[in-house]
């Protein structure tokens, strides 16, 4: 059993909420935080009770004021920078769990450009496009510094693709990688340019 070096941020309100729930369970019960399908677009985070007999040797323990959180070693890197809060609104209170790295593990600053761009697409750009039922996939980065993107879902064949690409996605990528990326291209435009002379 390892002690975690980095804690998941659990707000005081959320800790109090967990303590109240744990008081109704058998003594020695703590919580487990996990990710189902980690590293995929379908990743889901969850919290469950963790009775004393459910702690695994390979689990990582994070100690809080009145309880511990146990995390399996597979989920751990995907829960980096995760935050749990208990928010009270007019309609009642709810637990919120934000895990920006659940769908994709955080990449190092010195990772290859394609990995860093892919990480930004999965964690920042695709969540915005998901509101419109769309998503983009990074196909390659050309030698002259263009990210070649494929639009899928609701974006595919949509007349707004050019606007979305040029105004939103391209600006965002170039501003994040100013010295490495010159711009972005839609794969259909990229292929059309390459194959139009046959």
From Swiss-Prot:
Cofactor note: Binds 1 [4Fe-4S] cluster per subunit. The cluster is presumably bound at the interface of two monomers.
Function recorded in the entry: Involved in iron-sulfur cluster biogenesis. Binds a 4Fe-4S cluster, can transfer this cluster to apoproteins, and thereby intervenes in the maturation of Fe/S proteins. Could also act as a scaffold/chaperone for damaged Fe/S proteins.
Required cofactor names: [4Fe-4S] cluster
Entry protein name: Fe/S biogenesis protein NfuA
UniProt keyword terms in alphabetical order: 4Fe-4S, Iron, Iron-sulfur, Metal-binding
Family of the protein in this entry: Belongs to the NfuA family.
Family matches, as Gene3D superfamilies: Fe-S cluster assembly (FSCA) (3.30.300.130), HesB-like domain (2.60.300.12)
A Pfam short name: Fe-S_biosyn
GO molecular function, one term: 4 iron, 4 sulfur cluster binding
Binding site for [4Fe-4S] cluster: 155, 158
GO annotation (BP), single: protein maturation
NCBIfam families associated with the record: PRK11190.1, YhgI_GntY
Subunit structure as annotated in this protein's UniProt entry: Homodimer.
Cysteines joined through disulfide linkages: none
